[in-house]
């Protein structure tokens, strides 16, 4: 019943209130109409009469419209009715009071008009009929306005839905067109690839063929000690000419080597050294490495055969004192053996089982080195009984001069030989003689 009294549009209610000059009744509620129904007497005055003399608006708490109203009129009490005329508050109805209905009618102006109507009816019955017909017209007009407002709201909602549907349809059409264009472009690209029989041009940007035929060749050569040499050669010169220049200017010794290139990784052979630098694709500039050659004699070497070591000299003095009277031949043999020899050592034939190690024979086997490309001969083991004998000098690098002595006396008694293996001294025989 009360729902037909309230307007739906806030703007429309405010505009009609200002235009007609009537009171704007703003009903503030918290979604519960019990307070209004407790004192509202709809039987005394019809809703059409209230709608004719005032415009009613309903605001629910915590809504956007209620918050806007609270900004204009702060400290709004819920539930309450604000009666506003020309932008000013004339009356606020709130709380529990039996006179709310009379105050409302008095502020709206219906009370005075009702009294005048009662007196006119008594004096003039025809006027009463006219007023009744006019009230019917106003009641009809109020219903029509409510119906028109409802239809307007429905029409706006339909237009909004229609607009959204049209926008969605346009979006789908754009997506379909974009998909068709993409498919068409892919098909054209595929057919163009299949129909194109022209071979693709392959460009090699790694090296320029014209620069490979330059007349000069700059080589940067890294020696075995990490230092570098840089020189400019003619492209017609061979790699052997480069070797000769390196042999003259190198500072890392005279070890044999071969040329090695990092990119592309190539180790040049002896046959490649007869080719020109242009043929080997070293022009216009390249970097070479000196790679030391590994020979079969590089595993065994004798270092510093300049003189007897400290242990050798001590043993020489001790053995001279020991065998001075009994064994002069052994002493002379040891003195001959301890003489310095600067030549490479080759192992002799194995001795008998009584000897703890083999003896070495010194031979002059050095040959002159003609070029750095050939490895010089080095010490090679031969005829050794034990594998550890080949590493004799490397295992004792602290004492560079290692000699082995063999006593020839008392060969008829192999159980107790008098030998020196470079590590310890056998003194058992000397002790036995002292006891005697």
From Swiss-Prot:
Assigned keywords, A-Z: Endoplasmic reticulum, Isopeptide bond, Phosphoprotein, Ubl conjugation, Ubl conjugation pathway
Localization, UniProt: Endoplasmic reticulum
Covalent cross-link (Glycyl lysine isopeptide (Lys-Gly) (interchain with G-Cter in ubiquitin)), residues: 19
Modified residues (Phosphoserine): 388
Keyword Lyase belongs to the record: no
Pfam families in the cross-refs: UBX, UBX7_N
SMART domains, per the entry: UBX
Biased composition (Polar residues): 371-408
A biological process term (GO) from this entry: sporulation resulting in formation of a cellular spore
Residue span(s) of domain UBX: 212-290
SUPFAM superfamilies per UniProt: Ubiquitin-like
CDD domains the UniProt entry points to: UBX
Basic and acidic residues bias: start-end ranges: 325-346, 426-436
Disordered, as annotated region: 115-141, 325-357, 371-436
UniProt keyword Phosphoprotein, yes or no: yes
InterPro entries the record matches: Ubiquitin-like_domsf, UBX_dom
Gene Ontology terms: cellular component: endoplasmic reticulum; nuclear envelope
Composition bias, Low complexity: 347-357
Protein task: Involved in CDC48-dependent protein degradation through the ubiquitin/proteasome pathway.
UniProt subunit comment: Interacts with CDC48.
Miscellaneous: Present with 2190 molecules/cell in log phase SD medium.
Name of the protein: UBX domain-containing protein 7
Name of encoding gene: UBX7
